[in-house]
């Protein structure tokens, strides 16, 4: 199938330069702190919060990659041709976000190179965490193969379609294992629920959708008039509708979790009362609900500036939500006693914040390289 080249804004070297600078600075600080202090550079420990901001960052980026694949699958798997004009760009960003999440996890493990041989040589077949790594690795490979097919103008052959379906299946399996890692921990009541994988599924789709909106505007200079007819039609029609619908579903999930947690008197769920006293929770809620109300207006949701602002607000809110989900599940002490505080205090260190910068920098750097090397605006001729 032939490829139709979309009209892209000129390559912006600012993204490439900023991502390189962020990568160099963040890696330098993290490596220095790890060399000087070891894992003590992170404000986590085995007595309380053992998974902190780095794990929340990892979850955020890999689930954003998952959501981007869901968005691309609307065209690749379910044949909604209106999404084809952004599929190639979205698939490449999914690869970049996944590698950004892996980079954060590698440094959080304490020794970023030891895992290359330690994990394969200590294969734990009964561990969801182990299979999460296997399926995410398979998912990455399938994404790269699918992108190679698209880059070679093979969009809809039998093998290309099978790769798209296989990538979707692999990421669902990886996503299910990631949700199970949290949802199967009975000693952590905030996480322990069959709802956890479903919550991850809904928020992953939303984060992928808003990331697709932001990267599309970035590629076109944040102006709809720079877009091709196919991209502009998508951004004025189906895409904001998809964002609004998925945002409404996520708000219901958040409301259900909070309401259930506040109503229940089960030990360990008192953390939901503490969340209501958190400024971050209210910022998250205001960003989600406010964006949803704005997108309900048909006239407003078609405007580029509104889409950019709401997408950015929702993406930040989802990052806050990932942090709250990961950390709040651990702040209730497992072992009670008069010497144990009601809730464990945790504040991310500079090294942990630098891993956020590292993940974002890796993601944008890989995306910028792809923007420079490939025609990310290409789409099948039949979709235009």
Give the predicted meaning of each segment.
Residues 62-70, 140, 284-292, 359-363:
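Hydrophobic alpha-helical transmembrane segments
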Residues 14, 34-36, 55, 130, ...:
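Membrane-interface transmembrane-helix boundary segments in multi-pass integral membrane proteins
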Residues 34-43, 75-87, 109-112, 324-330, ...:
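Juxtamembrane/interface segments at transmembrane-helix termini
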Residues 19-40, 103-109, 173-181, 367:
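Alpha-helical transmembrane segments of multi-pass membrane proteins
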Residues 49-116, 128-131, 135:
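Membrane helical hairpin/interfacial module
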Residues 3-11, 20-26, 81-82, 120-129, ...:
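Long, contiguous internal "core" modules enriched in hydrophobic/ aromatic residues
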Residues 1-67, 71-74, 381-384:
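N-terminal signal-anchor module of multipass membrane proteins
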Residues 305-311, 315-384:
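TerminUS-proximal long segments
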């Amino acid at each position: 199938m032939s490829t139709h080249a979309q009209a892209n804004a000129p390559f912006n070297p600012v993204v490439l330069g900023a991502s390189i600078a962020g990568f160099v600075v963040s890696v330098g600080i993290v490596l220095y702190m790890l060399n000087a202090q070891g894992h003590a550079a992170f404000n986590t420990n085995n007595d309380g919060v053992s998974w902190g901001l780095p794990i929340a960052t990892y979850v955020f980026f890999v689930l954003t990659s998952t959501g981007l694949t869901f968005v691309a699958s609307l065209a690749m798997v379910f044949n909604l041709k209106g999404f084809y004009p952004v599929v190639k760009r979205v698939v490449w960003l999914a690869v970049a976000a996944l590698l950004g999440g892996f980079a954060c996890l590698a440094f959080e493990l304490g020794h970023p190179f030891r895992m290359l041989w330690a994990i394969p040589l200590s294969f734990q077949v009964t561990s969801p965490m182990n299979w999460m790594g296997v399926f995410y690795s398979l998912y990455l490979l399938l994404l790269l193969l699918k992108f190679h097919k698209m880059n070679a103008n093979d969009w809809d052959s039998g093998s290309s379609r099978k790769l798209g379906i296989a990538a979707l299946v692999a990421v669902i399996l990886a996503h299910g294992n990631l949700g199970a890692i949290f949802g199967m921990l009975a000693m952590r009541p905030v996480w322990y629920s069959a709802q956890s994988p479903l919550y991850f599924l809904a928020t992953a789709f939303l984060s992928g959708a808003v990331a697709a909106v932001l990267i599309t505007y970035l590629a076109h200079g944040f102006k709809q008039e720079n877009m091709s007819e196919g991209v502009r039609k998508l951004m004025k029609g189906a895409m904001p509708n998809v964002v609004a619908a998925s945002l409404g579903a996520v708000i219901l999930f958040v409301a259900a979790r909070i309401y259930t947690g506040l109503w229940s008197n089960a030990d360990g769920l008192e953390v939901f009362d503490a969340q209501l006293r958190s400024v971050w929770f209210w910022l998250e809620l205001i960003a989600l609900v406010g964006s949803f109300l704005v997108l309900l207006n048909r006239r407003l949701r078609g405007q580029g500036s509104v889409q950019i602002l709401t997408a950015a607000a929702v993406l930040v809110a989802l990052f806050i939500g990932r942090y709250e989900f990961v950390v709040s599940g651990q702040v209730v002490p497992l072992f009670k006693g008069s010497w144990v505080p009601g809730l464990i205090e945790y504040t991310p260190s500079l090294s942990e914040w630098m891993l956020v910068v590292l993940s974002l920098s890796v993601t944008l750097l890989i995306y910028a390289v792809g923007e420079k090397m490939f025609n990310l605006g290409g789409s099948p001729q039949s979709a235009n």
